[in-house]
């Protein structure tokens, strides 16, 4: 069974990975920014600052690649030491994960590997049964919350 590191937002993910008690060497990270309105910024931050400074390879799985090249996407994920799902619009994130078939892949990775699954905010919600999300604010409904169905790998409501 795998390891999940779910962050509410902020913090240094590498510190959490090292302190998880399940730490092993991380050489390859896959960044998933499906929820973000600016995934290139998040990817570059992970690549250049958070992990790149330690010589860790960071690869970017885009929504286009996930939706159009499932076999390539699966290979990329299975070859990772850590998968990081960034925050943003949780509804958009879950829609893309399900449409691309990655929901099944993530569940299998969790059950059959020691790959660390991680995420912040929307990226943390995705691993849980449900999440309390502000995704409606992306459509002009400021302050409104929505209960979003995650992958259910962890049977909790993430707020």
Question: Model regions: which residues?
Answer:
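Glycine/Thr-rich phosphate-binding loops of Rossmann-like dinucleotide-binding domains
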Residues: 14, 39, 93-94, 128
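Conserved PLP-enzyme active-site core in the AAT-like
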Residues: 84-85, 89-97, 126
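Broad hydrophobic/π-residue packing in well-ordered secondary structure
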Residues: 46-51, 84, 91, 109-110, ...
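N-terminal beta1-alpha1 cap of cysteine-dependent amidohydrolase-like domains
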Residues: 1-82, 86
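Class I SAM-dependent methyltransferase SAM-binding "motif I" and its flanking Rossmann-like core
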Residues: 95-96, 102-159
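Gly/Ser/Thr-rich beta-alpha loop segments that engage phosphate groups in nucleotides
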Residues: 10, 35, 89-90, 121-125
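Short, surface-exposed, polar/charged, turn-prone segments marking secondary-structure boundaries
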Residues: 32-35, 56-60, 88-89, 111-114, ...
């Amino acid at each position: 069974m795998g390891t999940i590191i779910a962050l509410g937002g902020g913090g240094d993910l590498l510190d959490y990975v090292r302190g998880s008690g399940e730490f092993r060497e991380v050489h390859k990270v896959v960044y998933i920014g499906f929820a973000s309105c600016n995934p290139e910024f998040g990817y570059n931050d992970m690549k250049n600052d958070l992990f790149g400074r330690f010589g860790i390879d960071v690869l970017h799985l885009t929504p286009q690649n996930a939706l159009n090249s499932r076999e390539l996407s699966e290979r990329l994920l299975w070859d990772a030491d850590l998968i990081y799902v960034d925050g943003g619009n949780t509804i958009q994130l879950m829609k893309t994960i399900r449409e691309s078939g990655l929901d099944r892949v993530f569940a299998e990775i969790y059950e059959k590997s020691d790959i660390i699954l991680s995420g912040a905010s929307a990226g943390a919600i995705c691993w849980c049964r449900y999440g309390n999300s502000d995704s409606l604010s992306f459509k002009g409904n400021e302050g409104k919350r929505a209960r979003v169905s995650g992958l259910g790998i962890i049977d909790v409501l993430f707020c």
